């Protein structure tokens, strides 16, 4: 499986194989969006948009220990944003899911509206045909790649679901659960 290669805001190149995005909604903050990327070696690179989270750069990327991040900030984040919090997995290497992704009604809200406008701007523009302001230096992806999201990808309540309880499930187990759910 080939990775997606991305240039991180003028800092360095990374290759990553999947991404999980968490969304949290509350009356005070209608949209609180962030994501983290799974690397081949098991490490993670995180991105935070909309609001600052302690330990992460605003609107940029940092490398971090995923388990430690969740241990330190998950409780605070859940309390801040209320009950509507979930993780959605996106497979960035499977073109077969592109058709489902194109039918996703939440495309504009979940992808174009927040963190991904700059991060995947070039990819969205070239593959999906959405016009947008973008800096081509941010992303370098081959034409064979596609950012995809299954229309029926389940939503995960990260506080109530046993499969996505970050306090007790390791990152590797989490990714296995998300892959399994996407394949069903």
Predicted regions and their residues:
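Solvent-exposed, acidic/flexible segments
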Residues: 27-30, 97, 138, 142
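Glycine-rich catalytic cores of cysteine/serine-nucleophile enzymes that process amide/ester linkages
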Residues: 3-91, 127-133
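Structural alpha-beta junctions
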Residues: 27, 32, 41, 106-112, ...
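A structural motif
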Residues: 77-82, 91-125
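Activation targets extended, charge/polar-rich intrinsically disordered C-terminal tails
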Residues: 116-184
């Amino acid at each position: 499986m080939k990775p997606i290669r991305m240039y991180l805001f003028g800092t360095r190149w990374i290759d990553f194989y999947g991404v999980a995005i968490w969304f949290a909604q509350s009356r005070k903050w209608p949209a609180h969006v962030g994501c983290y990327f799974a690397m081949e070696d098991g490490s993670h690179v995180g991105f935070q948009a909309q609001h600052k989270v302690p330990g992460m750069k605003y609107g940029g990327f940092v490398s971090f220990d995923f388990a430690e991040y969740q241990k330190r900030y998950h409780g605070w984040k859940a309390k801040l944003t209320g009950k509507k919090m979930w993780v959605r997995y996106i497979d960035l290497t499977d073109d077969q899911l592109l058709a489902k992704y194109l039918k996703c009604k939440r495309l504009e809200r979940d992808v174009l509206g927040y963190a991904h406008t700059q991060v995947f701007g070039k990819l969205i523009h070239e593959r999906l045909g959405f016009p947008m302001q973008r800096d081509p230096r941010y992303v370098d992806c081959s034409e064979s790649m596609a950012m995809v999201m299954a229309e029926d990808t389940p939503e995960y309540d990260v506080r109530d679901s046993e499969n996505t309880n970050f306090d007790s499930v390791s990152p590797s187990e989490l990714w296995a659960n998300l892959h399994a759910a996407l394949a069903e």
